Amino acid sequence: MGFEELLHKVGGFGPFQLRNLVLLALPRFLLPMHFLLPIFMAAVPAHHCALPDAPANLSHQDLWLKTHLPRETDGSFSSCLRFAYPQALPNVTLGTEVYNSGEPEGEPLTVPCSQGWEYDRSEFSSTIATEWDLVCEQRGLNKVTSTCFFIGVLLGAVVYGYLSDRFGRRRLLLVAYVSTLALGLMSAASVNYIMFVTTRMLTGSALAGFTIIVLPLELEWLDVEHRTVAGVISTTFWTGGVLLLTLVGYLIRSWRWLLLAATLPCVPGIISIWWVPESARWLLTQGRVEEAKKYLSICAKLNGRPISEDSLSQEALNKVITMERVSQRPSYLDLFRTSQLRHVSLCCMMMWFGVNFSYYGLTLDASGLGLTVYQTQLLFGAVEVPSKITVFFLVRLVGRRLTEAGMLLATALTFGISLLVSSDTKSWITALVVIGKAFSEAAFTTAYLFTSELYPTVLRQTGMGFTALIGRLGASLAPLVVLLDGVWLLLPKLAYGGISFLAACTVLLLPETKKAQLPETIQDVERKGRKIDRSGTELA
């Protein structure tokens, strides 16, 4: 008797699994609250050079700025330069003009801001940009914080993947909660930029535990029939986290208190560990029969499935252990051992890189829309709901491959069209970005489902973990691409759209999995690939 048969006896889907789904919803809410936190925490409000002896009289301030600050091409005051010598200023009181005798002839000389900056505090009371002046020449350091965070997530995923197999999912989930809480508090108390970047990278590593542990802990208690559906449904908690972050960000305008608010939910998470079950499958592979028996009994009781003592006897569980241990633990190298697996893995790598690259590129930099950051994120969060509903029907109607390729291609097209639309038409730009976000989210949701059906059972978790790592690489690079606007204003959009287009083309090289039997072994993948090679279409 294998574990799947044992799980069928105690109930592969019921109140026990639903309770588990609810208990593991909190990490899914926490992830977007930290992953998308830079939208508010690292926001750059309108700013200009700090000027000496600025008048207290508000009616004179605009005239004062005109004498000290050059204009940009759009008519706004420069954010990074000031005049070396004050320009002519009509004297409101005397009706004369005052000139600085030190002004050389010719074009007015401009210099960088040497005395710091003044910021518009109407939308944010403080951000990391305003606290450490991460603007102008230091603008890149602001983007680096997000990149370092996602690098931390990538590295943490490798560590947690190994440790959770060695010490258990439940124990490492507790470690993830505690370390996220501690490091989040340290980040909020950062006294300088270096401390902040370091603690945020470590926080990303801690949060990676949720991305690696929660899904297996959920799926290993579900029967095969309900795993895919539960996996897609659980992504709605991410959308809930996006909307919750928008609300919290609107209520809390200081980055330190906002970071604290995003971190404190770890406290009830730590308490919830008491009710989270360890994976019985993992316990059996470790020879911890009594613990596995305890959780299996609880599962059967909550699901209302009467089970005989013989089914959970030492002898019966030892047979399950024997069958589980027969299978060699897979590694990332196994994903490239055969020709068809190499094909699937390479295509999935490009797909996941493109999905993450475009999603975080759109989400983390939505400037120039003519909306407040809160309105933008509310739109972004709201549009994810119809995106998931659309995916639910499309994958059944036209299949996984065409849905994924179509959504990535549509994302690329929105970037392409936005290149042709004038930045002055805010309404059109806003509509394109929101539509692009909807397509990008749909591609993200489909990618989870599609990837899980491409890999055989023996490599499914390994394949999902590996492609997710590649995706996080795309997420870490996405914030830096914005800096390319210094080379050419349209280059970031071209990069996001180009990668999305390449990913869409790559997806078309993958086999369709709609109504196809899921592969169990590597041999199943190879046989399926040979059928496609001979006929050009899948013979499921």
Curated annotation (Swiss-Prot):
One of its GO terms (cellular component) is apical plasma membrane. Its main location: membrane. GO terms for biological process: alpha-ketoglutarate transport; monoatomic ion transport; organic anion transport; prostaglandin transport; response to stilbenoid. It is found in: Basolateral cell membrane; Apical cell membrane; Cell membrane. It comes from the Eukaryota. Functions as a Na(+)-independent bidirectional multispecific transporter. Contributes to the renal and hepatic elimination of endogenous organic compounds from the systemic circulation into the urine and bile, respectively. Capable of transporting a wide range of purine and pyrimidine nucleobases, nucleosides, and nucleotides with cGMP, 2'deoxyguanosine and GMP being the preferred substrates. It is a multi-pass membrane protein. Abundant expression in male and female kidney. In kidney, expressed at the brush border of the proximal tubule S3 segment (S3) in the outer stripe and medullary rays. In kidney, expression is higher in female than male. Also expressed in female liver. PANTHER family: SOLUTE CARRIER FAMILY 22 MEMBER. This is Solute carrier family 22 member 7. It catalyses: orotate(out) + L-glutamate(in) = orotate(in) + L-glutamate(out); 3',5'-cyclic GMP(in) = 3',5'-cyclic GMP(out); GMP(in) = GMP(out); 2'-deoxyguanosine(in) = 2'-deoxyguanosine(out). Belongs to the major facilitator (TC 2.A.1) superfamily. Organic cation transporter (TC 2.A.1.19) family. The keyword Zinc-finger does not apply.
